[in-house]
Amino acid sequence: MDGCLIVSHFHWDREWYRTFEGYRARLADAVDRVLELLEADPGYHFLLDGQTVVLEDYLAVRPQRRAALETALRAGRLGTGPWYVQPDSLLPSGEALTRNLLYGMRLAAEYGGRPSRIAYVPDSFGHPAQFPQLFAGFGLDTFVYWRGNGNEIDALGGTYRWQAPDGSAITALHLTDGYFNAACLPDDPQGAAARLAAYLAAKGSSAPRLLMNGFDHMLPDSHVGAVATALAALLGAPVERGLLDDLPAVGNGALPVYRGELIGGRLANLLPGVWSTRTPIKLANRACEALLEGWAEPWAALGRALGGPDEQPALRLAWKRVLHNQAHDSLCGCSVDAVANQVLGRYDSAVGLSRETITRLLERLAGHDVERRTPDVVEQEVAIFNPSPHPRTDVVRVALEPYPALSLQVGQPQFPRFTIAALEEPGFAIDGRPVRVVPSADPARTRWLPIESPLDVEFVAADVPPFGYKRYTLSRTARPAEEDDHGRTLEVDGLRVVAAEDGTLEVAFGDTVYHGLLDVEDLGDGGDSYDFDAVGNDPGAALASVTCRRLRHPSGLQRLEISRIFEVPLAVHEDREQRSEQGIALRLVTEARIAPGVPRVDLTVRLHNTARDHRLRLRFPTGAPATACLAATTFDVIGRSAAPTDDRGWVHPAPSTFPHQGWVSANGLCVVAPGLPEAEISSDGVISITLLRAVGWLARYGLRSRAQPAGPVMPIDGAQQLGPLEARLALLAGADPVAARDAELGLRGVIAGERPLLAPDTPLLSLARNGLQLSALKPAEDGDGFVVRVLNPTDAALEADVTFGIALAAVESVRLDETPDGGSASHDGAVVRCDVPPHGLRSLRIRT
């Protein structure tokens, strides 16, 4: 290309160092100007940052401009999509990224536009290796990006073929100088053209001749037409004004090929500290994804197939709140405190909507009265549901609300009975077996008396069928005593847990024993929301005291409660050279639980953070050296090296940490840590999981770990995360993604009724356990059936063998965008089979 393409655009962070509403006021001004320029200049085009949410945000305050906006979209002069929200690339789940593209393309079409076929990700902090497979599943053939390259970019150049582990490939175009190489042009068209001509000459003919005319939250330049004319005269070649879709096609055969992630800092800041900034946001995000992907979507799909109502509107509403939060400055936590508070508020809303939707879905299937009247009986039927495509035995916790034996009449007789707290300590049994009664930890549970919390019951539900439920009878009984002593050992079914004198755990899976688990590392952090920055002369955490309590219940549930108090420095000195001499006590409480029939250790970690400017990690020694570990990543399992990266000459030094999607495994020990996405594997075989990284600045200068600026220098005291923090982890033997997902999703129980849509002990969907994972079970976006998606994270081709408990009318192989892909899938009665390539995804539309 002798000439060049000028793309006028802005990059629009919906919230960052201003709140969403603060930026939306500026968005209204910016899009007003864009529409004026489109009307005045027939050659003008503008890219709305590749995210369709901008349309919603703008029209919410400018509804009278919808016709003008739709006219520009239909004419192809205003570019939007394919994303709904420009996301962070590494922290959302693969399914969340898929919903993002589904919603983005849907919204673009609703406004009359054609979503861009370019996967534009200008500013996210690195990218997963499976992006090419994701984008190919939506018919996107080009990836335009800035951050993430390591040393491979020296050989690849500005344009190359990026190949996913399954073999899918797209053309990648690297914005070497960012998405702003033609921003802030001089007012004089000739001067602006001269600057751009000099820039192009310096880049040479091998670089993509793409000029990105825009920057963060900037009003568009109004004289781009005159600049393009002047530049064409200087170059003696055509200068086009258009969108990224107007980029000329590049011959794939002549391009170098790259396979792997993009998580390097060779040419641009990677900013990996965001993987651990503001832990509550990460935990809330993962909880929402698990509720929607693991519970709400599957049961909405199956419930609809069984004749229940359509819950798609509720799912979309919840997903949109989650996706709003997956913009990189929101999910990454690198924003001001007001934004972080609003992000958590959206997650609370999404959690509430998801939980209520799930409860209603399960209650309908189990036949509970839609009016939820409490029958005047002394026993209650409960239904325990399994969200997995294989039988499960696991611990389940059921809320006693409503429960007749605990209900009293409040008010007039014509009003319903209400559940209130018991005046004495009740006991309960499930099918005659004792259950553990515990106070509810849910602050939203209704209370009618101030004397006691509402109650839950906990027990082990055995052999719950795949995507089905098991029915139990809950009855009142004498409350059995729980053994409470100072013992330090738990043991069941060949699984042993021992609390050491220092509060760490010894865990034995059969003959394989691991020592020193849950050791604590606490280091000073002089960095900011973007990067960890270690300080010198760090005393770390000094263990001050340890107490241990053992509780063993007749139900078979066994727990160790270990409380450790550490002395840590209060903060980092203002010069950031060392931590303060003044210390402060920091308390960490760990509950380790085992249960019969459940081959794992469940961990609940509660920290009350009292210190500032530090990173606290939980360490899991695996007992042997390690050159690498395995970790969950976007739509795959990936190997992570323990060796340092050669980062000589990099703009941003390579971190020793890495992001993960739920679990990390080395030397036979798997640490499941959903919502704690930062980990490290050391050469001596220690897995480290970051529990908290407390910082007080959005960005700072003078870091050892980063030479270039990253954002505005603003205090964010909320990111110090003072106060309580709770996280749930688990320990497993091996590296089984399915078992890790089971630990995360658990089981759920609801009150059962007399008119179930589904009979108990009926499996609705099962997947043969041969290494495949169920990635999605969801209603089809167009309402025509539902979609089953299977992931193969292994190096071998596998056959998916899916058995349904409902009659099937038709089966069709589809892409990720749920359009037919021409793939084959056999359908023999209730059994569907299809091949899944190594590291590949297969999606099937099921009609009933």
Placement of each model-derived feature along the sequence:
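Acidic, His- and aromatic-enriched active-site or binding-groove loops in soluble protein domains
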Residues: P63-P82, P132-A155, Y160-T171
